[in-house]
């Protein structure tokens, strides 16, 4: 490949540290697609003959068939997927294989391959996220009016509906989809034809290869084209944000499945047992999703540190761009699939959710709001009165709506029997009818919008 410049071959350790074929073999489909587009363009531009181009294309198809059936053989002497493919092509078709690399460098070749791979990865993630959103919306529609406690600081705060809670995750995933879509749009420029860094003297048609590979256009600066790994960082940053959202939902399932909470029962198919404690049903799938989020964030940090301070154009450091992306994608795909399965099959224990909502004085804010609306008391004063009522209820060991009217009047004489209409969890939830609030009608309206966007009937 480049031996003409050197008087001796690489040391064994150099061969090992230099080789990327053990991991970049995952790019074989993209590498062959890029090569076929490149040779078709070379023929059109009369840089290679039609006969040689046809032979090269046929040979590439044969190599692809071998890879699909047998996998990519790992030979450190061949260094990377590009040379492995070109080497096998030469074995199959002979001399014409040597013309494939005309007007191309491995710098623009790998930049193209990697963009194609990340684009495919984004499309795969998008399909998984749609399935997760469908699961969330479907379960939310079953529980649009099911009351549960809303929390702040993991303390009971105000009643909400389970449907409202699940739709919060739908919104998070919608933002994640938007981030991946933005990343896809930015990466969809083709660097092929930038060559090593300065472009090429051959009369190539970069627009042709860009179109053939499904890119919107060729990139506009050859130096940037071979140096750029923003698209990989964009993917990892979007993946990290998504993994944080999945981790939050996983954490809630873990907490909710514990005996003190008892809000959910995770199915056996997403749980494991204990080697010593026969009674255990451990939420291992959720815990692994939570754990994977840390590894995905680590992958993002790894590539950030690799790219920090690199001069233009290509440096060998950039060979380490692919392992963190591959690892993050594999972990993310597993996490999305596992979380979708859990959402689809988890059993929500509605009576326990309601019971928990009725504890912890979750309607205290409703008492304060009632004092503002009905008794025309400034909110800060109403807040103080309500705090006194909560302290009394806590001392007596009863809920706010179980305090006798005499006790409430003793706190403030402006309170009357009408206050009890505001103190039930159902009344509290129904009153939160502002746009985007937890009132069942609002939740159902947001569910209907989500179903329309996702193409869900009913």
Swiss-Prot record:
GO molecular function, a single term: argininosuccinate lyase activity
Reactions catalysed, as given in the entry: 2-(N(omega)-L-arginino)succinate = fumarate + L-arginine
Annotated Gene3D superfamilies: Fumarase/aspartase (C-terminal domain), Fumarase/aspartase (Central domain), Fumarase/aspartase (N-terminal domain)
EC number: 4.3.2.1
Signal sequence bounds: none
Protein localization: Cytoplasm
Superkingdom in the source lineage: Bacteria
Keyword field contains Repeat: no
A Pfam cross-reference name: Lyase_1
Pathway given in the UniProt record: Amino-acid biosynthesis; L-arginine biosynthesis; L-arginine from L-ornithine and carbamoyl phosphate: step 3/3
Alphabetical UniProt keywords: Amino-acid biosynthesis, Arginine biosynthesis, Cytoplasm, Lyase
Any one of the GO CC terms: cytosol
Biological process terms in GO annotation: arginine biosynthetic process via ornithine; L-arginine biosynthetic process
InterPro entries, per the entry: Arg_succ_lyase_C (IPR029419), Argininosuccinate_lyase (IPR009049), Fumarase/histidase_N (IPR024083), Fumarate_lyase_CS (IPR020557), Fumarate_lyase_fam (IPR000362), Fumarate_lyase_N (IPR022761), L-Aspartase-like (IPR008948)
Family: Belongs to the lyase 1 family. Argininosuccinate lyase subfamily.
PANTHER family listed in its UniProt record: ARGININOSUCCINATE LYASE
NCBIfam families found in the cross-reference section: argH
Full protein name: Argininosuccinate lyase
């Amino acid at each position: 490949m480049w031996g003409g410049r050197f008087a001796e071959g690489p040391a064994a350790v150099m061969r090992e540290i230099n080789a990327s074929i053990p991991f970049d073999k995952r790019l074989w489909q993209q590498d062959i697609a890029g090569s076929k587009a490149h040779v078709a363009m070379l023929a059109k531009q009369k840089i290679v003959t039609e006969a040689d181009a046809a032979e090269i294309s046929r040979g590439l198809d044969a190599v692809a068939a071998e890879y699909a059936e047998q996998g990519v053989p790992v030979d450190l002497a061949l260094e990377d997927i590009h040379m492995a493919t070109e080497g096998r092509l030469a074995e199959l078709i002979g001399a014409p294989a040597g013309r494939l690399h005309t007007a191309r460098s491995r710098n623009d070749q790998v930049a193209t391959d990697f963009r194609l791979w990340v684009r495919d990865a984004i499309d795969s993630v998008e399909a998984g996220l749609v399935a997760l959103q469908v699961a969330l919306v479907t379960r939310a529609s079953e529980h649009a009016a099911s009351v549960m406690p809303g929390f702040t600081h993991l303390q009971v705060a105000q009643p909400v509906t389970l449907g409202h809670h699940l739709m919060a995750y739908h919104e998070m995933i919608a933002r994640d989809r938007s981030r991946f879509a933005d990343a896809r749009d930015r990466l969809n420029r083709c660097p092929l034809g930038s060559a090593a860094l300065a472009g090429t003297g051959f009369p190539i048609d970069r627009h042709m290869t860009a179109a053939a590979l499904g890119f919107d256009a060729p990139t506009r600066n050859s130096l940037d084209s071979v140096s750029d790994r923003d698209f990989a960082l964009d993917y990892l940053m979007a993946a990290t944000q998504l993994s944080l959202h999945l981790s939050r939902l996983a954490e809630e399932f873990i907490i909710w499945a514990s005996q003190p909470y008892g809000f959910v029962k995770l199915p056996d198919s997403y749980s494991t047992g204990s080697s010593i404690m026969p009674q255990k049903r451990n939420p291992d799938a959720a815990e692994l999703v939570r754990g994977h989020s840390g590894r995905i964030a680590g992958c993002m940090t790894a590539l950030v540190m690799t790219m920090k301070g690199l001069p233009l154009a290509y440096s060998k450091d950039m060979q380490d761009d692919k392992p963190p992306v591959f690892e993050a994608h594999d972990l993310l795909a597993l996490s999305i699939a596992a979380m979708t399965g859990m959402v689809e099959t988890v059993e929500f224990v509605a009576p326990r959710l309601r019971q928990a909502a009725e504890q912890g004085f979750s309607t205290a804010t409703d008492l304060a709001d009632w004092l503002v609306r009905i008794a025309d008391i400034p909110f800060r004063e109403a807040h103080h009165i309500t705090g006194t009522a909560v302290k009394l209820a806590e001392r007596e060991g009863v809920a706010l709506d179980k305090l006798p009217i005499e006790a409430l009047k003793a706190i403030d004489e402006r309170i009357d029997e009408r206050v009890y209409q505001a103190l039930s969890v159902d009344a509290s939830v129904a009153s939160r009818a502002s746009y985007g609030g937890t009132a069942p009608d609002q939740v159902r309206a947001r569910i209907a919008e989500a179903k329309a966007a996702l193409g869900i009937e009913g």
